């Protein structure tokens, strides 16, 4: 086993994206302290669970700090050296970064400057991109995602990735790339170049592996912004949206929602239908849904037809099988989903 890098890290992370990165740090640096925001309440009466990063810290016997009332309960240790953030969601104050000998680095799941902001993975899927990626950069003391790029790796997409799968692959690739950054001491100011371009370039495999490549073969990207996602982004309009748009929404959120009989209805795992003749659905209007041969629940889009595979949920009820629901709703005669 290779000796650990003599580095004391404050790791700031929250969700599943941060887990492979934290595990990599545990294996390759001298000491890790974990800082996270609180988890999200799963129900109105339920307790707030620990976020994934906190549970991983506990499982490995690491010191864990849950931020409360801003940063008031966070205290530096004299031997803290470097902050590393991954899907943390908060700005690290200058007074903290300024006390660390090596400042901080951030791991962002996009090919910066493309998709600066809060929702890069969602934007990648919603826009139907064919490339995703990860950037490791220094932390800027004034703005998100504006530091100096240290390393970048891209991933070729097949157009079927879900948010969960894409996040997992990118986080595994990011973990591998972070190890190269630390081994080459790129967190040290005197090891950073004055150029904008990253010093490490890579390609992420579809299993999350990392292959280093030359900068000459690395694509370039225009600056853009990834907005913060809201529930409205999963609101589907079958009358104005084409099949690909809706499929991208389903891949991003695992569901879309619309209105049926003046109530919200959630449709899970919605896919384009490829295996039947157009005669089976050509008569349908956008938004109309019907059973096909009693084993598929179809819904018509602006340009084609889709099948609801994962289930249907009405308001606060449980998810039910789409075919069984289709057999009972309106006596099996179908209906029409509305936007409003």
UniProtKB/Swiss-Prot annotation:
Enzyme kind, highest EC tier: transferase
InterPro entries in the record: Formyl_trans_C, Formyl_transf_N, Formyl_transf_N_sf, Formyl_transferase-like_C_sf, Met-tRNA-FMT_N
Q: Name one GO biological process term.
A: conversion of methionyl-tRNA to N-formyl-methionyl-tRNA
Top-rank taxon of the source lineage equals Eukaryota
Keywords recorded for this protein, A-Z: Cytoplasm, Mitochondrion, Protein biosynthesis, Transferase
- Extract the GO molecular function terms from the UniProt entry: methionyl-tRNA formyltransferase activity
- Major place of residence: mitochondrion
SUPFAM superfamilies according to UniProt: FMT C-terminal domain-like, Formyltransferase
Its Enzyme Commission number(s) read: 2.1.2.9
Q: What does it do?
A: Formylates methionyl-tRNA in mitochondria and the cytoplasm. Responsible for the formylation of the N-terminally formylated (Nt-formylated) mitochondrial matrix proteins that are encoded by mitochondrial DNA. Nt-formylated proteins in the cytoplasm are strongly up-regulated in stationary phase or upon starvation for specific amino acids and are targeted for degradation by an E3 ubiquitin ligase-mediated fMet/N-end rule pathway. Increased Nt-formylation of cytosolic proteins appears to be important for adaptation to these stresses.
Name of the protein in its database record:
Putative methionyl-tRNA formyltransferase
According to its UniProt entry, this protein's organism is Schizosaccharomyces pombe (strain 972 / ATCC 24843) (Fission yeast)
Q: What is the lineage of its organism?
A: Eukaryota, Fungi, Dikarya, Ascomycota, Taphrinomycotina
């Amino acid at each position: 086993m290779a000796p650990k890098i003599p580095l004391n890290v404050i790791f700031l992370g929250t969700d599943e994206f941060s887990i492979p990165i934290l595990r990599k740090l545990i294996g390759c640096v001298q000491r890790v302290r974990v800082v996270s925001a609180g988890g999200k309440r799963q129900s109105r009466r339920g307790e707030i669970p620990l976020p994934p990063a906190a549970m991983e810290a506990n499982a490995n016997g690491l010191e864990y700090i849950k931020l409360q009332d801003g940063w008031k309960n966070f205290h530096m240790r004299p031997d803290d050296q470097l902050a590393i953030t991954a899907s943390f969601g908060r700005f690290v104050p200058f007074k903290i970064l300024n006390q660390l000998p090596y400042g901080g680095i951030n791991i962002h799941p996009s090919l910066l400057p493309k998709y600066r902001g809060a929702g890069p993975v969602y934007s990648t899927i919603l826009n139907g991109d064919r490339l995703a990626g990860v950037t490791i950069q220094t932390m800027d003391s004034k703005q998100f995602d504006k530091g100096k790029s240290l390393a970048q790796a891209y991933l070729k997409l097949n157009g079927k990735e879900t948010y969960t799968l894409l996040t997992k692959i990118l986080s595994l690739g990011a973990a591998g790339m972070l190890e190269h950054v630390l081994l080459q001491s790129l967190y040290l100011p005197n090891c950073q170049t004055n150029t904008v371009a990253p010093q490490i370039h890579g390609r992420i495999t579809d299993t999350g592996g990392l292959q280093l490549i030359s900068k000459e073969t690395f694509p370039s990207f225009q600056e853009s912004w990834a907005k913060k996602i809201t529930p409205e982004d999963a609101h589907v309009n079958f009358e104005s949206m084409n099949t690909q748009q809706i499929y991208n929404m389903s891949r991003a959120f695992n569901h879309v929602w619309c209105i049926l009989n003046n109530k919200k209805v959630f449709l899970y795992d919605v896919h384009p239908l490829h295996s039947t003749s157009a005669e089976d659905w050509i008569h349908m209007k956008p938004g109309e849904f019907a059973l096909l041969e009693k084993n598929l629940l179809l819904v018509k889009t602006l340009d084609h037809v889709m099948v609801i595979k994962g289930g249907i949920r009405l308001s606060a009820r449980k998810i039910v099988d789409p075919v069984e629901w289709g057999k009972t709703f309106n006596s099996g005669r179908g209906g029409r989903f509305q936007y409003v």
